[in-house]
Amino acid sequence: MTIVTNLSFPRIGARRELKRALESHWRGETDATQLQHTARELRARHWQLQRDTGVDLPPSNDFSLYDHVLDTAFLFDAIPQRYRALADADPLAGYFAMARGRQADGIDLHALEMTKWFDTNYHYLVPELHRDQHFALRGNKPIAEFEEALALGITTRPVLLGPVSFLLLSKTVDGSNRLDLLERLLPVYTQLLRQLQASGAEWVQIDEPTLVLDLDAQTQQAFRKAYAALNQGPRPKLLLTSYFGPLGDNLELALQLPADGLHIDLVRGTEQLDAVLNTLPAGRVLSAGLVNGRNIWRTALDNALTLARYAQGRIGKDHVWLAPSCSLLHVPVDLEQEKNLDADVRNWLAFAKQKLSELRVLADALDNKPEAETALTQTRQALEARRQSPKVHRPEVAQRLAALTPDTTQRNTAYPQRSQAQQQTLNLPAYPTTTIGSFPQTLEVREARAQFKSGKLSESDYETFLKAETERCIRTQEEIGLDVLVHGEFERNDMVEYFGEQLDGFIFTKLGWVQSYGSRCVKPPIIYGDVVRPAPMTVTWSAYAQSLTDKPMKGMLTGPVTMLQWSFVRDDQERAQTCRQIALALRDEVQDLEKAGIKVIQIDEPAIREGLPLRRGEWADYLNWAVESFRIASSNVRDTTQIHTHMCYSEFNDIIEAVAALDADVISIETSRSRMELLDAFVKFRYPNAIGPGVYDIHSPRVPQEEEMVLLLKKARAVLPPEQLWVNPDCGLKTRGWKETRAALQTMVHAAQRLRAE
């Protein structure tokens, strides 16, 4: 019999039950007992769903109240000193303080740093370690959840983040080498594995996703040392698990490690199958990741079946398990909830539950069960319908793409000439001031949008409300003395969804939520077909806003790469091609904004860096088409029209050439928290265009002092010519309150005025 297994199931619940339970607890409305009750209910439901769907060996310890990397740090007592007293007195409060920070009862703790989980849209909390770090088992979460499932009659495979990946995903606060801590960490892992075996666990899944990265010799040696140590003494069987790409030059290393099974991603790394089968040690299980755990399209089951049959033919049926390519954390729970989705598009999709069903079909087909043929036929029909659908393929888009030339991506003249033309048109002072785009979305704004969407507020009344909010925002900016204004974006819910709702080729689910971090869930758009802009998207609001003021008004757009990165993207063509389609739609919007009298247009690209492939050797190709897409969107304007972009990264050194190649007239970046250190990359590179280094952190309600901003600007002025500098906050102001926004912007304008006066 062919075994079906799973690496991890979404935690949040089909209707975001975990989100609601967490936020209720954080508001003090429910206690820890009630929160844990909801967590147990979700785990039980998810284990049962997996068994009912045909999963032979579901995972346990894949559930988390916030983040699995934080769980690992907490489990091994890697708790920074500032949280220690709270964690000892109240473990759950300490855990959430590490995740979210805490300001209560005289305690003021900031949270751990958060960053992207590899190249996904999930965020993990970065453990803080130090040279003298001590590790010890704290609690028994993996064992407790294994036994919890066992009490329900379900045998699971506990999931652990592996020791080397745990250290590589952490940071040291004292500059010491993370891998030097491996020797102290390994005895704790060994102890945990021994306890899991004593509890009855036959298999443990040990995730080492860093095996798909570029690894130096020291890191490769750390893997050998770690797994030699874990192989000493009693332990369950280990399934060494890689995902998010092929093992590549780490394949030999992975096969040298003493594990009993190996999971490989055959969606992103189909080409590695032969190499794995040629060198897999005899008797070792191969877990074949055949179903895409990161996207929402039905699997081409015939193709997957061919790979699975080939693998079974090479190493035997008993040694090939079927699995998703990676955790199902990255997809929504259940397509069956989407009752109102376009029927054709719905038939092309598979969410977490459906992906497990696909694996069961594959297993049944491999076991020659006749019922599999019906499902295989349905899949073939769905895939063929998608291939032939006029909803997917628009001839006019193909024609536009074919007509692209190098000139399509070029401005009329170089930046020095353009900047002179723009200054003559805009007549801006030195150190011009602006904001990044959004202004506070108050409770009134959110309630009005909700009432409009539910039909309780008419379109005309909603428009009247939005116009009033927009005018109030503009008058406030004029009173503060900002030089280039924005309209506030009160009509927008989300910087991708707002545009996606107005573009053909995008579709939105009602309950297609995935976890971004903690209780924050996002509902990514689905790009199912060729992207076309049927009508202008932002021109009406930008033109209205410009009519209210004599100062320049920025048109605000989300860039093509960001729209791509934050969506579920069609898998029937290259991502680069889809990105160019979005860029062409934005190109039309940019042209219409210019025709409507908008002289400054900002195209935000916060996601260019996070789209970088995991292997550095693949960066150049990605950056080439990412830059090309931005330039397709932004290059069809007169010299007098000023193109801005905004980026919020913690590192620019390794992509600075690509950032310069965008050829935006002005780039605003997030620099206040690094005290302008991020500017070093621009200085070393001699970045030629204008830069707006953020002078205050919008993620905090704190209003900085004028002197702080002046010092930051002087620091910037010391390394960049004054004529290159703009003055702006770090990011958009959507999540802030009006009181602190007004005060902070007023202070920012005063700081700019002081520098002008010098």
From Swiss-Prot:
Biological process (GO), any one = methylation
Enzyme Commission code(s) on record: 2.1.1.14
Give the protein's recorded name: 5-methyltetrahydropteroyltriglutamate--homocysteine methyltransferase
Cofactor comment = Binds 1 zinc ion per subunit.
Tell me the cofactors it needs: Zn(2+)
Q: Tell me the pathway.
A: Amino-acid biosynthesis; L-methionine biosynthesis via de novo pathway; L-methionine from L-homocysteine (MetE route): step 1/1
Catalytic residues at: H699
Q: Which CDD domains match?
A: CIMS_C_terminal_like (cd03311), CIMS_N_terminal_like (cd03312)
UniProt lists the gene as metE
Q: Does the keyword Repeat apply?
A: yes
Which SUPFAM superfamilies does this entry report, sorted A to Z? UROD/MetE-like
Q: Does the keyword Calcium apply?
A: no
Per UniProt, the keywords (alphabetical) are:
Amino-acid biosynthesis, Metal-binding, Methionine biosynthesis, Methyltransferase, Repeat, Transferase, Zinc
Provide the binding site for L-methionine.
I436, G437, S438, E489, D604
**Catalysed reactions listed for this entry:** 5-methyltetrahydropteroyltri-L-glutamate + L-homocysteine = tetrahydropteroyltri-L-glutamate + L-methionine
Q: Where does 5-methyltetrahydropteroyltri-L-glutamate bind?
A: R16, E17, L18, K19, K116, R520, C521, W566, E610
Q: Name the Pfam families on file.
A: Meth_synt_1, Meth_synt_2
Residues reported in the UniProt entry to bind L-homocysteine:
I436, G437, S438, E489, D604
Q: Which family does it belong to?
A: Belongs to the vitamin-B12 independent methionine synthase family.
Q: GO molecular function terms here? A: 5-methyltetrahydropteroyltriglutamate-homocysteine S-methyltransferase activity; zinc ion binding
Q: What does this protein do?
A: Catalyzes the transfer of a methyl group from 5-methyltetrahydrofolate to homocysteine resulting in methionine formation.
